[in-house]
């Protein structure tokens, strides 16, 4: 909350009950017993509070303009908070200024009695109602501009070069978390946002808070997809943009469904966003998960097809022919190299949601580890390399299982590979 906004509340909250208890205030607190002087004394007493509202409201507006220049969600929420307070408080001030004048007192005299304190200090401008009206319009304008600026920020995907980039570790983008935070808080300001959208010029297509929130979320998801589509990637990193989308879409859909771990909020969020958008994003999340696996861990399975029909032994011997030995070498070497590359890539990636991370790890392990174990058991004892059998048997089934399960945990390949399986770079094309 803005500091100036905090200062605005005490005097403003005192105005409404003061208005309701004008006679008691004038009679018992101010010592005025004549009904003819009730209004005059009352208005003179509350003039400092009205003046304080105007002064602190103006100060809050200056502070707000500085805070909302970067279109951050906290600045937008502060603008809505202040506009909502102005919507509630300033009409009370205006009503106070419109109280009927007492008999026998000229309007000009009454205005002077309100605008000058006993110590001679100027309290209100010569046109206090115009001051209040102008302040309310400025507060409304600042809040409306903050709504427009944030929607533009989201539609552009952020600012500068980063607006076209995915996060380096494929994690949830900061704009995703801030937009979801804004969505949750927008529900609290729904009457105020509806009021702003109904009374300001239609720079925004949305006619309600719900339409605005849905539009911002749609624009943000589109910008995420655009980032992923334009991400420069090599073969081993082809799955990273899909992990990025999966992380972000999962964050959006799971928090809409759970309401940030609050069931009443979840029900309101789902109604606010709508089942139509939620279904689309859940489906997109599943598609990106499938594509992520197809371009990463599933590629390992291509090296584990059973090559028995293609293997031939040398005549009169159980040793493999040169060509058959090369078949097994290519399979083990291809698997080892790709596993190493994928592990290096995904050690640098992050999956912040523990449930999603466990799901991805378990699925990769269940697909690859059993098939590699069978392949290893069947062919690791076959002498397909004269000098460098250990080079091709670099990873044991336990190593592979560990690599798959530590893929997002920052464990290096050197820490996992068995020491006795160190590489030997010498050539070995002959089996004898």
Question: Model segments located where?
Answer:
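Long alpha-helical rod scaffolds of large eukaryotic non-enzymatic complex subunits
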Residues: 1-432
